[in-house]
């Protein structure tokens, strides 16, 4: 009942978004995704302009995309601030694991330091996606040749960046999801809730 009342009060406190704001928000997310892909998965063409003059078109598109992205982000920021959505966002709680029996929560409660260290190490290991990003951005710095072999090298770098970045976000979400406060003893092992109830009855 308490959880239902809390959810009801939270839903009442939420400020509804207008249709125009929702459209601009979706457009901004789409443009930001394109800009994100362009920044991290597309090589810089600055070193190709001298050998391939038409590469300047890609450079111009890159600049236009960056300007549009910045403009949309600024517009959404001021619309959020004007309508008071930032206050509502600050009230929202971070997502936590809601499973009754969760091995990750059990490991966190039993070995809290090891749990934090393990996930931080995994996040730091996948952080070498920065290496792939750097190699992609400066792919044409030393060699401006464009052929099938070079494109296959670029594809392997892009695939490596996608995999490492996906792992980075996965482990980061897992770290945040299972790092919340765990009530009681229900997730210590597979029979945590049952064993706690039995020990309580025996005592």
Curated annotation (Swiss-Prot):
Keywords: ATP-binding, Membrane, Nucleotide-binding, Transmembrane, Transmembrane helix. ATP binds at residues 192-199. Present with 967 molecules/cell in log phase SD medium. The chain crosses the membrane at residues 60-80, 114-134, 157-177. It comes from the Eukaryota. InterPro entries: DUF4668. GO terms for cellular component: membrane. GO terms for molecular function: ATP binding. This is Uncharacterized protein YLR036C. It holds the Pfam family DUF4668. Its main location: membrane. It is a multi-pass membrane protein. It is found in: Membrane.
């Amino acid at each position: 009942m308490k959880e239902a009342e809390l959810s009801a009060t939270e839903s009442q406190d939420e400020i509804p978004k207008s249709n125009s704001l929702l459209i601009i928000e979706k457009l901004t997310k789409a443009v930001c995704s394109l800009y994100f892909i362009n920044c991290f998965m597309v090589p810089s063409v600055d070193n190709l302009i001298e050998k391939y003059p038409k590469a300047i078109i890609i450079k111009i598109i890159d600049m236009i995309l960056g300007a549009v992205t910045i403009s949309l982000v600024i517009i959404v920021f001021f619309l959020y601030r004007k309508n008071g959505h930032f206050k509502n966002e600050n009230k929202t709680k971070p997502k936590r694991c809601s499973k009754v029996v969760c091995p990750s929560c059990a490991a966190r409660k039993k070995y809290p330091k090891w749990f934090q260290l393990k996930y931080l190490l995994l996040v730091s290991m996948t952080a070498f996606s920065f290496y792939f990003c750097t190699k992609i951005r400066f792919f044409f710095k030393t060699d401006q040749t464009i052929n099938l072999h070079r494109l296959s090298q670029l594809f392997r770098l892009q695939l490596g960046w996608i995999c490492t970045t996906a792992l980075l976000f996965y482990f980061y979400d897992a770290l945040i999801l299972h790092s919340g406060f765990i009530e009681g003893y229900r997730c210590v092992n597979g029979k945590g809730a049952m064993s706690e109830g039995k020990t309580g009855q025996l005592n």
